């Protein structure tokens, strides 16, 4: 047995058995593409578990993270974006990140990079429409950026995110208070100011953050619901703030 990432992989004696048991949907052509992209000359089944202590576990760890652990459609969707971006066009992924590939310049292989970006753009559009509905292109982009910035603050600056969340709840409890949320400014990272009595917040972040973050996931969908639930005549008079 092989233990990786605090998970015991049962009956895994080689990379080949790992593919057949832990990576559903991976067949021979996919394995050959990996071997070609990462320039592995030896077959995967030659690396046994007993030799993995001396062998670099990066390759196996890479597969274990990107492939889903079951046949759930949500895990499969999460893996599709990785397979489309790395497996199908590893060179394009390197060029997109501004990194050289096999000694080439970053400006080369433009056609494959263009095709890869088209596939990724269509994939993102489909996912955004599933989350936010059939909104226009600009609204989709704004919603996606607002959700991303809100999640970024929650994951990296949780104390500031919680302070903004408490400030929002405190403001909404007041009577005759209209809470304005500027989605355009939030999508550009212009988040305003915190209260001067904020504790545990640096001066730099006080100038960047107010009640524009601190929301639950999907807050933009609820915020835009009123805009797209009215008639066309009234909709023309409304605008995102």
From Swiss-Prot:
The keyword Ribonucleoprotein applies. It is found in: Mitochondrion. The keyword Transmembrane helix does not apply. GO terms for cellular component: mitochondrion; ribonucleoprotein complex; ribosome. InterPro entries: Rbsml_uS13_C, Ribosomal_uS13-like_H2TH, Ribosomal_uS13_CS. One of its GO terms (biological process) is translation. GO terms for molecular function: RNA binding; structural constituent of ribosome. SUPFAM superfamilies: S13-like H2TH domain. Keywords: Mitochondrion, Ribonucleoprotein, Ribosomal protein. Belongs to the universal ribosomal protein uS13 family. This is Small ribosomal subunit protein uS13m. It comes from Paramecium tetraurelia. The lineage of its organism: Eukaryota, Sar, Alveolata, Ciliophora, Intramacronucleata.
């Amino acid at each position: 047995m092989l233990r990786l990432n605090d998970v015991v992989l049962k009956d895994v004696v080689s990379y080949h058995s790992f593919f057949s048991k832990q990576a559903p949907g991976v067949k021979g052509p996919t394995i050959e593409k990996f071997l070609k992209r990462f320039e592995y000359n030896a077959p995967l089944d030659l690396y046994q578990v007993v030799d993995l202590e001396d062998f670099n576990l990066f390759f196996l760890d890479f597969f274990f993270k990107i492939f889903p652990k079951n046949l759930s459609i949500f895990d499969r969707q999460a893996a599709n974006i990785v397979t489309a971006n790395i497996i199908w066009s590893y060179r394009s992924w390197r060029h997109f990140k501004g990194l050289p590939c096999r000694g080439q310049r970053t400006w080369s292989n433009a056609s494959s990079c263009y095709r890869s970006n088209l596939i990724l753009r269509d994939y993102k559009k489909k996912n955004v429409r599933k989350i936010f509905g059939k909104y226009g292109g600009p609204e989709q982009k704004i919603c996606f950026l607002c959700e991303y910035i809100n999640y970024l603050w929650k994951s990296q600056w949780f104390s500031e995110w919680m302070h903004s969340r408490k400030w929002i709840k405190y403001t909404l409890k007041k009577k005759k208070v209209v809470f304005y949320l500027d989605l355009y400014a939030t999508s550009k990272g212009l988040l305003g100011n915190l209260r001067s009595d904020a504790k545990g917040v640096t001066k730099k972040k006080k100038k960047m953050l107010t009640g524009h973050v601190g929301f639950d996931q999907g807050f933009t969908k609820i915020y835009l619901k009123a805009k797209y639930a009215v008639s066309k005549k009234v909709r023309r008079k409304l605008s995102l703030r």
